[in-house]
Amino acid sequence: MELEEQKKYFHGTLEITIFDATPFSPPFPFNCICTKPKAAYVTIKINKKKVAKTSSEYDRIWNQTFQILCAHPVTDTTITITLKTRCSVLGRFRISAEQILTSNSAVINGFFPLIADNGSTKRNLKLKCLMWFRPAYLEPGWCRALEEASFQGIRNASFPQRSNCRVVLYQDAHHKATFDPRVDDVPFNARNLWEDVYKAIESARHLVYIAGWALNPNLVLVRDNETEIPHAVGVTVGELLKRKSEEGVAVRVMLWNDETSLPMIKNKGVMRTNVERALAYFRNTNVVCRLCPRLHKKLPTAFAHHQKTITLDTRVTNSSTKEREIMSFLGGFDLCDGRYDTEEHSLFRTLGTEADFYQTSVAGAKLSRGGPREPWHDCHVSVVGGAAWDVLKNFEQRWTKQCNPSVLVNTSGIRNLVNLTGPTEENNRKWNVQVLRSIDHISATEMPRGLPVEKSVHDGYVAAIRKAERFIYIENQYFMGSCDHWESKNDKICSGCTNLIPVEIALKIAAKIRARERFAVYIVIPMWPEGPPESETVEEILHWTRETMSMMYQIIGEAIWEVGDKSHPRDYLNFFCLANREEKRDGEFEAVSSPHQKTHYWNAQRNRRFMVYVHSKLMIVDDTYILIGSANINQRSMDGCRDTEIAIGCYQTNTNNTNEIQAYRLSLWYEHTGGKITADDLSSSEPESLECVRGLRTIGEQMWEIYSGDKVVDMLGIHLVAYPISVTGDGAVEEVGDGCFPDTKTLVKGKRSKMFPPVLTT
């Protein structure tokens, strides 16, 4: 099995240590006038993609080690190590992936002569380096890694793995009282995120730090009259934050400044974040609000600060003292328009209840013309312990880089603020948690090991996938990557969508097929990315998504063919989306006008259907490890030099009482299937089983028929629908029906944009 994979794929971790190079020595007669050396650095590329860079050193001594994740075709992969100064290329050394894999020694070590651009060897210029390749199949699985306590977290991250943390997992902003997923006959405590956020902010005594993509100060967090905190009903975020600041709490708000947003001409910007509204609201108050652009050396307006965190102090639980500790929330939710929703994800039945009608995926939509609204499904997490302090540190590093650090609180001067890192008696503080980021030195101080870029979110995804033994469950707003394996040669070259997550999943499935072991992957994404489906950006993102799906199914189909199995690619990999369809009821909101006939808006309203927008960013592996945060599965989020992101990767060290990761997955499945999949179903506790795969797929296919049919039939709370593609036995992806999403003229397979460069849409 492993040898077959190695013949095709350079798949594993390439560790390269750059030691030093021949010292600077100008040739005669320039040695009399050019006595000062220039700072030199080394870059490492896989094919045309730069994957590592050393610091610049005058003495040409670096002693820097890089772990480079690889999942590339063997025949087309070359590693290029280049010695440079700021103004010139001094020389290169190239080695093919095939040479590394067929080397007699596991280690390639030595002083290597460098080659000039004209192909001549520079005998007096050598670079000392060491290369060592570890195939991915040698990675221990999660079960063994945790039993042996060998998993110590992601190496190239700013923050280490922290023990003795408390983690609470959330789905959706709020839940109805009737939402009751159960695990082993015990109700899963599905918490109400926005109520918990309100209570946490209200109880803060020293600091409330918020980093966001957007924030609406007029947003109401608590709206349910049956809440435990009735005094909070109707209170806006802005009112709450101003009140806390007047009590002496340091409230600091750091929002992304969309530089395409120009309030003087009433242009809301490409992303329509309306952050100027927050800035104006907090002006002349004790709340310090700052707008920070995502600075970038090439395209200053193209990328975003996409982190979503709330960090504050909270009372130490189960303590009779007045000690306080740090708590942090992070994930997919911003405190802004359209995010409030429940597990019901209604289209038409809640239009008259709140003043935040949100529908950005239908051109011309507004409340006066009626629904459907855009339902919102998202996931979030709160953490207490050492990892919460790391989220605080991330905020401080970003604020220090772009704002005035003097307005930050000196936490070491707060006497009763403690960091409880040691073992405790609390059963719920049995989590190991690591904070992961996508960020660079332009946006944060104190980068890990002096590296200019951190992409530990990407590395965390890859590490978790490589350790997977049974199944993977993903919910994400986007799913694209691994362009080196795409079918279109032009897309491979121009897209730059090189993150390895999709191909890692496909190679994991292929390896399991060759080993004749069960394995299953479930991926839930939106029907289309947010925005009118006929827009060029949406259509191009759909195109990249189709390339990614096709590549994965092709790899799986080839593995099935190689072993002569009679299984189908969809016995291993399935894509789903969420959707709703509602029959009309008495008492619904009545629009004062109607959409133009034959438009997408008119069709969706007449057919009473629309997608549930999946904004989650989470991955669950083997019910053992969960990665959750703000990062999408695309190049913008995984690159490190594009959007800034934050996430946590975590697992329980003791699951004797409850496996909370499994309970969370089952709660999500309970929501998506309207209670059809519960913890009582044997197959749901064995997600890798063919029974479970076919059970979920059957639900998805049946609900797609109801959703896409001509007759308006209520989906009765079952939102899981099969993504509208057909897959052949050999892994070819084909169209379903007319190839368009219902009510639209938009092709499911998308198409390339003639206007936007791929760097914006990948």
Swiss-Prot record:
Task: List ligand-binding residues for Ca(2+).
Answer: 172, 345, 377, 671
In terms of CDD domains, this protein maps to: PLDc_pPLD_like_1 (cd09139), PLDc_pPLD_like_2 (cd09142)
Q: Where in the cell is it found?
A: Cell membrane
Q: What is its EC number?
A: 3.1.4.4
Taken from the UniProt entry, a GO cellular component term is: plasma membrane
Q: Name one GO molecular function term.
A: phospholipase D activity
Q: Name one Pfam family in it.
A: PLDc
Q: Which residues form the active site?
A: 306, 308, 313, 615, 617, 622
Which ranges carry the PLD phosphodiesterase domain? 301-339, 610-637
GO BP of this protein:
cell division; cellular response to nitrogen starvation; cellular response to phosphate starvation; cellular response to potassium ion starvation; multidimensional cell growth; phosphatidylcholine metabolic process; phospholipid catabolic process; positive regulation of nitrogen utilization
Q: Can you tell which superkingdom this protein's organism belongs to? A: Eukaryota
Q: Which family does it belong to?
A: Belongs to the phospholipase D family. C2-PLD subfamily.
Protein task: Hydrolyzes glycerol-phospholipids at the terminal phosphodiesteric bond to generate phosphatidic acids (PA). Promotes growth and plays a role in nitrogen signaling.
* Name by which UniProt lists this protein: Phospholipase D alpha 4
Report the source organism. Answer: Arabidopsis thaliana
